[in-house]
Each structure stands twice: as C-alpha cells, then as structure tokens.
C-alpha cells in the first residue's frame, strides 16, 4: 500500500474536518482520511518538534532517543544570527543523530518503498551524517534547520542536500514590521 504520514506541529485533533471540526474546511485532508485510515489514539513522542521526529523515525522511546530538545550547536558559531546563517550554511542545523542509527525510511526502502520527507528535519546539519537523504529518504524538500521554519517567507529551502533559494527577502523572526 501507499503510505502518507502527516505529522504537524501544534495541530490538534479538533482542527480537522475528518475529526468533526466544522468551522474551517479541510477537504483534501478529509478526502485522504476517507480513502485511507486515521488515528484516534495517537500521541507525539515528546512535547517539542525535533525530539518527536526522532522518536517517530527511530522507534525509540523518548528516554532513549538521541535528540532530547530543539538544541542548536552553538559551538559552530553564531547559530542564532539569521543573516549569518543565510551567508554560511555551516551554521545551520541541530545536533545530528549517530550515523549508524536505523530510521524507518531506511527500513521502508529495504522493503521496496520510495521515501520522501517534506517539511522540517532538525535532526542534523548540512553535511552531517544525519541529513534526510543519508537517513533513508530518497527525496527531501524543506527546512534542514527547524529554526528556519520560524520565518514566514524563508529565503531558502533544501532540495535533498542542496539549498534552493526562493527569492524571498530575509525577515528575521520578531522583527517589527512597518
């Protein structure tokens, strides 16, 4: 069977039409639900995003997962400076999981599936041993560094291992707009 798994930050079960929400239309997700399966008793692995993805992709219990928080690797330089990150991709990204980690996408590839991840990664930095493609995804498009997802109009996203510039101006989060 084809498998599409949607994991969304800060999305509650009561916000989708397929679970009874009536104020905001979600027709495409509702159709996926009608034609597939939904979960009514499903919980994230932790309260924050990168550790939840680590738990989901590795199958490890939160207490044994490699990623315990949305940590930046400050030892690499001025990682909180969005302008510096735009100029130097080596400042981007979170702590990587160990290279020998087996993740669900790698297991699915062994079973003959083609795998893709679209959205936030946050489980390593560009060039590390734990980029999405090195962890089993055939295709990745999105934010390598989850912190970059806090900008409304990102200046770049990643297509597999490479930055793809989007011609959006950098708007640093919490900047007062005129």
Predicted segments, located by residue:
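Formylglycine-dependent sulfatase
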Residues: 1-178
